[in-house]
């Protein structure tokens, strides 16, 4: 899993402050905007934070990508297994961590599977993934269309997505997906996005009390 910055609105925070002062044109060019952005956050004036956007590149797997793509306030571009050979990203499918199902919460897992048992199960998963990749390659070698051959690939297959959204959308996404109730693998991505956000929107992050 990796997250990296692709692009951001130039002078993103200053741009939001400039637009926020639309009704006070005499002060629009003021460089003292930290207090204004803090005020807007404190009083839930969120439309201001829709005026700057950020694009991130995220490398994950197809299973987690499906969760990310549900955030419809963003725009996305994803690596196409229909157009391109999946092995262009990686010819190896990483074996996932294994956690026990929480019997009281279907959307939670507990990290208490014994190491010996986990290694044994992961060995079987690795064998299954290797077989899936060999079969995928065999189908392509026989001239089967990529759009058909891809159906034999597991959800753990690596993918790459570009995720673009406003500062406001990123705040919502990071708050939601870094909280309890999010799958660990997705939470790790949200926390990595948060680190990028803190560097690119330092005043906003400080006002949100993001550590």
Feature annotation, model-predicted:
Residues 1-211:
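Family-specific signature for flavin-dependent thymidylate synthase
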């Amino acid at each position: 899993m990796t997250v990296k910055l692709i692009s951001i609105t130039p002078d993103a925070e200053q741009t939001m402050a400039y637009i926020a002062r639309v009704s006070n044109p005499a002060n629009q060019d003021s460089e003292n905007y930290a207090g204004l952005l803090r005020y807007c956050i404190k009083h839930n004036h969120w439309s201001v934070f829709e005026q700057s956007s950020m694009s991130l590149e995220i490398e994950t797997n197809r299973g987690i990508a499906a969760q990310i793509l549900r955030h419809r306030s963003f725009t996305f571009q994803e690596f196409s297994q229909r157009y391109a050979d999946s092995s262009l990203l990686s010819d190896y499918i990483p074996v996932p961590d294994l956690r026990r199902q929480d019997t009281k919460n279907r959307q939670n897992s507990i990290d208490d599977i014994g190491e010996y048992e986990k290694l044994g199960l992961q060995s079987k998963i690795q064998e299954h993934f290797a077989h899936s990749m060999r079969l995928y390659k065999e189908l392509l070698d026989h001239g089967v269309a990529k759009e058909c051959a891809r159906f034999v690939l597991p959800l753990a297959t690596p993918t790459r997505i570009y995720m673009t959204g406003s500062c406001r959308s990123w705040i919502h996404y990071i708050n939601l997906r870094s909280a309890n109730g999010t799958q660990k693998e997705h939470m790790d991505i949200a926390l990595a996005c948060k680190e990028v956000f803190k560097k690119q929107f330092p005043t906003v992050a400080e006002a949100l009390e993001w550590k």
